[in-house]
Amino acid sequence: MFLLCLPFAGGSVTAAPASELTTVAEVRALGGAGEFVEHSVRLRGVILLELAVDPTTGLDAFMFADASASIYVASPPGRISGLKRGDLLEVRGLAARGDFAPIVVASGVTAQGTGAIPPPAPVTFDQLATGRFDGQYVEISGIVRSSRQAAPPDSRALAELSIGGGRLVVNSQDGQAQSLPVDSEVRVTGVVFQQFSRTGQAIHPFLVVPYGVPIVITRPPPADVPLRRIDRLMAFSSEGAPGHRVRIRGVVTHHQPGESLWLEEDSHGIRVHLHESAAYTVGESVEVVGFAVQGNYSPEMEDVSVLRLALANPPRPTVLKT
């Protein structure tokens, strides 16, 4: 997913070279509707994030930042060998449209020592979802909903955060995301990338945390996970920590392996979303720890762990009158 969503696949230009641009913000301002006019660029700034070789072009790739903004740069192979985050560069080349946002195709890269990484911009999920922050260095806070190592051959360390307005996947280059405690509150600093459609429209953002940039746990998971009745989930309460895990208990009434589990408690039912493939038996009593969310008709549970308690008699079905 990460490589497929990088904003370059041979970015297009359609007109003769125009004036030279000297800031990243000027290059980004070329994006938008209308014909893209090629400009030469001469930029001075730092490597913000080291990336893998672009799979569609074979060019080296990195995120580059000056005081005005940051941008994706594609460079001829070998030009940035040995360079790292924080190295100060002069980049010469052309501005190109890119597949989502403007990029720079470098013809020359000159190392000039070490520079300062610009501070991250504090953002909300709603701001990220617009696509406007694609490629930018940002800071955002949320609650860890899951953390894992991606399945081979993917080697990414991933965490998924619940943030006001949505959910954000975080990929940390040094692996720390996969060990974040579920239900902890964290502050994450990284570079925004955007999943986008074939027509270049924003679908969903994700964040890449550079090597050496810590993910800060601002609050560990609550020590006690409160037990709630199914019919009181998401009901008014002046206590508790909104957005954190809860526990429920119920009897299994239906199971779709790897997808959903339906529970009932005193004639009140709930759907539990599953990622595991374990089999459950109708009539089995279980305890579920996870996050309550609003479903189409009633609360549901996501990102759960399930504890088997006992085998009981299935609940009696409700008789519907016609």
List the model feature ranges, each with a label.
Residues 1-11:
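Bacterial N-terminal signal peptides
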Residues 16-322:
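OB-fold single-stranded nucleic acid-binding module
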